[in-house]
Amino acid sequence: MINKIINEFSTPFYLYDENIIEEKIRFLNNLNFKFDSKFHFAVKANPNLAILNKINHHNFGAEVVSAGELFKALKSGFDPSNIIFDGPGKTEFDLKYAITQQIKSINIENLEEIDFINEYSLSKGLITNIGIRINPNIDGYTLDKITTGKTGGKFGVSFDQIDFDSISKLKGIKLSTLSEHIGSQITDHHQLIKSYQELIILADGLLKKGISIETLDF
């Protein structure tokens, strides 16, 4: 097959095996969790519109980190309610575009983003769902360049920096999500479980204060 394609098209080119993609998707969708869950595909991993369209048709959501990725997710058919916006490098344009598209959640990485999202949402007569990326101060025991859950890092917000009561009173936003990501290429699953437990404990504590979190984003 590959030789036939090489003869038909000029090289170089990317060749994707649809059967393998669908096999991986089915494996994930068949995992038996004891709670409601949904996988979100990181668009940065492959922004090819045909691939995104295929993934969208298998009940996946999309995770984006820029206005360009959000545009591609929408163009490939993802419903805004199934798109989350992550990343520490959001521009004002990114935020404005995400707000007007009314996506599932904009996960903030610093408290200044909250003020901007609230004010812009109010100016447009909208209420925007946000999440807060929590920095749980848990080491992923991976390479220094890709560990992201320790205090003092550039990713996420520490527990003690967040005034949840004040955030819950803002009229232009709704805090719906708590998010965390302590790093990549982690081989010690105990650290991952520990970080998940910290997020669950935080969500339970907020519920006791009357602040209901709808989604935990791992």
Enumerate the predicted regions with their spans.
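A charged N-terminal "starter" segment
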Residues: 1-128, 170, 174, 201, ...
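Glycine-rich, aromatic-flanked loop segments that form ligand/cofactor-binding clefts
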Residues: 127-139
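Active-site loop/helix belt of alpha/beta enzymes
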Residues: 137-218
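Generic beta-structure capping elements
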Residues: 88, 133-135, 181
